[in-house]
Regions:
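Hydrophobic membrane-embedded segments
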Residues: 1-125, 140, 156-166
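Cytosolic-facing loops and C-terminal tails of multi-pass membrane proteins
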Residues: 2-5, 31, 92-130, 268, ...
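Transmembrane alpha-helix boundary/anchor motif
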Residues: 20-24, 123-133, 237-241, 253, ...
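Extended, hydrophilic extramembrane loops/domains of integral membrane proteins
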Residues: 83-84, 282-292
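Polar-ligand-bearing catalytic/cofactor-coordination segments
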Residues: 138-222, 248-273, 297-315
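Post-HEXXH active-site segment of zinc metalloproteases
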Residues: 221-252, 271-281
Length: 328
């Protein structure tokens, strides 16, 4: 633990270099990669962020990363672990360098760095815990959707996305836009004001359909799990502005990927209508107050990017899909 602070900072520097390379590569291949491929690349990079917390032995006679990973590979045949074991030498070299430099730094500096880092973690954990409590309170105050017409529309949307599970749908007075929330027991929540506007005829069933399809695509692609991972990364990397930018970009890519998934279900003549739904409800679907929810909401800048994505969207060809998979 004495040299952990320096090793962690060293790993952050290396991670930033890799992250800069990834962002540059994605910008270079932006036209070759679909929104979903861009998002998937970012998710894969999240695995790199656990490297500083993996156990590494500093003593030559102790078990090194390569030994641990090789043993793990021989036990469960995990391909990814085998790949990492091949880089064990480089990882140990980084560890040895961190140990040699950290021993030259006074102990109180290590202690001070860990102290401030821990304070930040405590604050971020508190904010994350508060978000979990908000989601729980949202569920406690919500009621099962009673509108028969909307329930029938929801069943149609489930069939459109070929969902194998019927996700419960609730109504609530504490939201401005529909959201998907709940890690173990996901649910979709519709704002009561949208239901009232639908009954009054000021919102069409088409608008509600697009919103429901958007939430169901979040569920289908396990975006809630990714959302929890993103918030966990925020906790431990609260001090790194490049990581914050990267996580913000993942959220933007998630919405672009979700929009593209919805558009793939629609006819080409419906693309404009879907974009109009985002524009017409831009004020209503402001940012959700709950960070752990998935919704169609976003700030004006994000909505502008999504509208441009919708305007330029076209169904990917077979060659484009193969090219994207090969790049990823």
């Amino acid at each position: 633990m004495i040299y952990f602070s320096f090793r962690f900072l060293l790993c952050n520097a290396i991670i930033c270099i890799f992250l800069g390379s990834l962002l540059g590569l994605k910008n270079l291949l932006q036209r070759q990669l679909s929104a979903r491929m861009q998002y998937n690349l970012s998710i894969i990079f999240l695995a790199v962020l656990i490297v500083p917390f993996l156990p590494i032995s500093s003593a030559p006679s102790s078990i090194s990363w390569s030994h641990l990973l090789t043993a793990s590979s021989s036990t469960n045949g995990d391909i990814q672990t085998t790949f990492l074991s091949g880089n064990g030498y480089n990882l140990d070299k980084i560890n040895d360098f961190a140990v040699s430099v950290s021993t030259q730094i006074p102990t109180f500096i290590h202690t001070l760095l860990v102290f401030f880092w821990s304070i930040g973690i405590f604050i971020m954990f508190f904010l994350l815990y508060r978000s979990v409590r908000q989601v729980n309170a949202l569920h406690s105050s919500a009621l099962p959707l009673q509108n028969e017409e909307l329930n029938a529309l929801y069943i149609e949307c489930l069939n459109e996305v070929n969902s194998k599970h019927t996700i419960p749908i609730y109504s609530t007075a504490f939201l401005k836009s529909p959201v998907l929330a709940g890690f173990l027991h996901p649910r979709i929540y519709l704002p009561i004001h949208l239901i009232s506007d639908f009954n009054a005829g000021t919102i069409s069933s088409t608008d509600i359909r697009y919103m429901l399809l958007h939430e169901l695509q979040h569920y289908k692609h396990k975006d809630i799990l990714i959302g929890y991972l993103i918030n966990t990364v925020h906790v431990f990397y609260w001090f790194n502005p490049l990581i914050w930018y990267f996580l913000k970009r993942i959220r933007q890519e998630r919405e672009l990927a979700c929009d593209s998934a919805v558009l793939q279900l629609l006819k080409e003549t419906e693309y404009k209508s879907y974009g109009n739904t985002l524009i017409n409800f831009a004020e209503t679907i402001a940012l959700s107050p709950f960070p752990l929810t998935m919704g169609i909401s976003g700030n004006i800048k994000q909505l502008k990017g999504r509208i441009l994505n919708i305007a330029s969207f076209h169904q990917p060809t077979f060659k484009q899909k193969i090219r994207g998979y090969l790049i990823c």
